[in-house]
Design a protein with these regions (language model features):
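Extracytoplasmic
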Residues: 297, 313, 455-527, 532, ...
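Membrane-interface helix-loop-helix junctions at transmembrane boundaries of multi-pass membrane enzymes
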Residues: 154-155, 205-209, 364-365, 407-431, ...
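Membrane-interface junctions at the ends of membrane-embedded or membrane-associated helices
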Residues: 74-90, 137-146, 208, 359-367, ...
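Active-site lumenal/periplasmic loops and adjacent helix-entry segments of GT-C-fold
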Residues: 55, 61, 182-184, 203-217, ...
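Transmembrane alpha-helix segments characteristic
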Residues: 35-44, 214-224, 371, 570-573, ...
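Hydrophobic/aromatic-rich transmembrane helices and adjacent perimembrane loops
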Residues: 62, 66, 188-195, 343, ...
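Membrane-embedded helix bundles of polyisoprenyl
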Residues: 91-107, 132, 172, 218-227, ...
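Membrane-embedded, hydrophobic transmembrane alpha-helices
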Residues: 1-12, 19-213
């Protein structure tokens, strides 16, 4: 018997053929669209009313502003020729750029129309609706041929187990961070790290039974677990740069309006930490620190996935997986990046830029337009990332242009994709002088003309020039010690003496009564504290020590070997690409030149004076790993080639995983004898310096309620802005937190001592690119001021 729905001769039911359940077939096909529409309505209601729905409300708001628009754009035919991970990278970058530009448009257009708070929930929700409708209509006109359901159907048992294991690591990372925040131990976080190590090994072992999509899902979850271990530490904003980022965000959020003049600082020019988090906060209505702690990490965890996709352009699975292991195992990824959310968002534009430049199936104009759009997003997100990327592009263009001077016998098809050898290789060049100049105009236009915050870069250029011609000595960050040829920098005490001389010069330019008397200050010494206290040896560490293995030095040796080994492997890999051609398929010319440009920028920051202090060399190397990590892995394999090809691959993987186990903190935590890491302990330098305690928050709230605080001034350990007023009623771009170094204390100021200074007797200053700890003389405050607040974790003197 033929049902009416399938009977070509039967009457056509209104709304289409009827399924056995009694509903039209179109309803069955479009159930996802109806569910999405209902969710959008619910998200709008929750965003505008602010009605609290724990967990579900914030998740729905994030889906509304980011996830659903990304899905709509990802499932269009505009990305034909790209895999799903690459589609995700392009789509996420495009949606973030739309959110940045759309928020900037609201901020610019609405105030002249009488809307004083253009970034309130209603305008932001309307913007999200407009983006959703536009992308939905675009998707209807350009539907994607492949279906995401096909990807789900091809998961397989191995992929399912890998995904479940990686998801468990994320859950353990969240639980472990919460346990540490409640004063418990780091055992759960350590188990999560162990799971990450096991799954990284299984990814390599089972790579032939896994499709690239499932490898990408596993990489995403493992990366997210590492990020959340750090970002979720503390119930408030914890970290270094993120304190100032949060301050800039609160200025925008509290007024629902971004104004560069309210805080004339380069941080405030980064829309990724002003307008973007304000939009997220207005539709999620979550406790504001968790916009940075959770939602930014959910987006940034896509970056290693895109790194894998970049590597898969030219390299097999095992090299691409190991490239990701080196990328997420580099300490900057999980110890610094969660505290550098503006750079996290900038990386979300770096990756699509690299993918677009090396896309062989796209036309030249399309690649260049994608590159320029990515540069715009980069500049709006983070100035330093844009400067480094622009420098890398310039070097890459010079390298490409100079390749025509290579003798003919060496030229051949070196650096060209196999499908683009010969004359087509030259036609495939994305970089041009026009593209470089356009990117430069974007950087100067936003940083120089629109916001006037490019002065730091100009000053750095002048300082470098002055150092090179011998007028000044120049300064270097202590991080350059991790280079292949480290220099012997000044001692901590020498640096602290230089800081003291600088503060004395500052005093000399002011009235004598502006600071505490010099005779009083001279009675209190501030010796530098050298060395970081290591964790005690564990049972496993004591066992190794009893066997004659110096555990105290072992971890440090492994870290140094990791730093220098990665640089050495990169050099070997690049040398092989450039000069060893026999039997090897060279990567693309564009990719090779990008590698050269990235390494050149890291080298310049390391070698040139002053740059390493303002443009962190470790962060620059993290950015370079997006392109050079697979070259690094290939170089490690070549270095071990005397073992035989098969054994060299296994040995290279073993070396990479061993370094990974050490750099993420697993081995030091198991053995002890190494400084404690914040993601695993409630101790250590980062914990003492950057962790925000509830008592400190209570002290700042009490201080903000006192009359006449800002005119009198506030002094605190100012390597971070965690003592700045950030609540909506008190945040002000005019507030300045002066340092508490004894020579800078003013008689009438309020002096705030944090948890670490009270309990360890130490404070820190950041000088010439170095963090310097010193013994703080509490007696100078007791002799010159009155203790007006003490809650056991913070003290305030007046």
């Amino acid at each position: 018997m033929i049902s009416p729905a399938r009977d070509p001769g039967g009457p056509v039911q209104p709304g289409g053929p009827v399924q056995p359940g009694g509903l039209p077939a179109a309803w069955h096909r479009d159930w996802a669209a109806w569910a999405s529409a209902a969710s959008i309505v619910a998200a709008n209601v929750l965003a505008v009313t602010g009605y609290p729905v724990p967990f579900l409300g914030p998740a729905l708001g994030f889906w509304f502003l980011v996830v659903h628009p990304v899905y709509l754009l990802c499932t269009t035919s505009v990305w034909d020729g790209s895999g799903w991970a690459e589609r995700l990278g392009y789509s996420l970058g495009a949606v973030l750029l739309l959110a940045l530009l759309g928020g900037l448009g609201l901020n610019t257009v609405l105030p002249p129309l009488g809307v004083g708070r253009p970034l309130d929930p209603f305008p932001v929700a309307a913007l999200a609706d407009a983006i959703t409708v536009a992308l939905y209509l675009f998707r209807r006109r350009n539907p994607a041929r492949p279906s995401w359901r096909q990807c789900l159907a091809s998961i397989g048992p191995v992929g399912g187990r890998m995904t479940a294991g990686a998801g468990a690591c994320v859950a353990l990372a969240v639980l472990g961070a919460n346990r540490l925040n409640n004063g418990a131990g780091g055992q759960v976080s350590l188990i999560a790290q162990g799971g990450i190590l096991v799954l990284a090994f299984l990814l390599l072992r089972c790579r032939h039974r896994l499709q690239d999509e499932m490898i990408c899902v596993t990489i995403y979850l493992l990366s997210l677990a590492l990020l959340l271990m750090t970002s979720l530490r503390g119930w408030y904003v914890t970290g270094h740069d993120i304190q100032t980022e949060y301050f800039a965000f609160q200025l925008t959020y509290s007024h629902a309006h971004w104004d560069i003049s309210s805080f004339s600082n380069a941080y405030n020019a980064c829309l990724s930490i002003t307008i973007l988090p304000t939009e997220l906060a207005q539709v999620t209505h979550v406790f504001n620190p968790y916009v940075f702690k959770v939602f930014f990490q959910l987006m940034f965890a896509v970056c290693p996935v895109l790194g894998y996709t970049i590597a898969r352009r030219y390299y097999p699975k095992w090299i691409s997986i190991m490239a990701v292991v080196y990328f997420i195992g580099f300490p900057t990824f999980f110890t610094d990046m969660p505290f550098l959310t503006r750079q996290e968002m900038a990386f979300m534009f770096v990756c699509p830029a690299i993918l677009a430049m090396t896309h062989r199936q796209w036309g030249l104009r399309r690649r260049r337009l994608a590159l320029i759009a990515a540069c715009l997003g980069m500049e709006l997100s983070h100035y330093s990332t844009m400067y480094l990327f622009l420098g890398a592009l310039t070097v890459a263009w010079l390298a490409e242009s100079g390749s025509r001077w290579i003798p003919q016998r060496w030229r051949g098809t070196v650096g060209a994709e196999p499908a683009m050898a010969g004359g087509a290789a030259r036609d495939s060049r994305t970089l041009s002088i026009g593209a470089i100049l356009t990117a430069t105009v974007i950087a100067v236009g936003w940083g120089g003309v629109a916001t006037g915050t490019m002065g730091g870069a100009v000053a750095d250029a002048g300082a470098v020039a002055s150092s090179l011609i011998g007028k000044t000595a120049g300064i270097r960050s202590g991080d350059v010690a991790y280079g292949l040829l480290p220099g012997s920098g000044p001692s901590a005490q020498t640096l602290l003496n230089g800081y003291r001389r600088q503060t004395m010069g500052q005093r000399a330019g002011s009235a004598s009564a502006a600071y505490l008397p010099a005779a009083l200050v001279a009675r209190y010494r501030t010796p530098a504290v050298t060395g970081t206290q290591a964790m005690p040896l564990t049972a496993a560490g004591r066992l190794l020590a009893a066997a004659g293995i110096p555990v105290d030095g072992l971890n440090a040796v492994i870290r140094q070997a990791a730093a220098r080994g990665e640089q050495l492997f990169t050099i070997i890999g690049l040398t092989a690409i450039l000069f060893v051609r026999r039997g090897r398929r060279p990567p693309g010319r564009e990719y090779l030149c990008l590698c050269l440009g990235s390494i050149a920028m890291v080298a310049l920051i390391t070698v040139l004076p002053d740059l390493s202090a303002d443009y962190d060399v470790l962060r620059a190397f993290q950015e370079s790993l997006l392109v050079v990590a697979p070259v690094l892995v290939a170089g490690s394999c070549l270095a071990l080639r005397p073992l035989g090809e098969s054994r060299a691959i296994r040995a290279a993987a073993a070396v990479g995983l061993t370094l990974f186990a050490s750099t993420i903190g697993f081995v030091p935590q198991i053995l002890g004898g190494y400084p404690a890491q914040l993601n695993l302990n409630n101790s250590g330098e980062d914990y003492n310096t950057y962790y925000t305690h509830p008592q400190e928050v209570a002290a700042v709230n009490w201080l903000s309620s006192q009359p006449g605080v800002l005119p009198a001034g506030v002094q605190a350990e100012n390597i971070t802005d965690r003592f700045a007023f950030t609540s909506p009623g008190t945040v002000s771009g005019q507030q300045v937190i002066a340092d508490i170094y004894p020579t800078l204390i003013r008689p009438s100021s309020w002096v705030v001592l944090g948890y670490s200074t009270i309990h360890t007797g130490q404070s820190s200053v950041f000088y010439e690119g170095n963090l310097i700890a010193y013994a703080y003389p509490l007696g100078i405050l007791q002799a010159s001021k009155n203790l007006v607040y003490n809650d056991g974790g913070a003290e305030i003197y007046r």
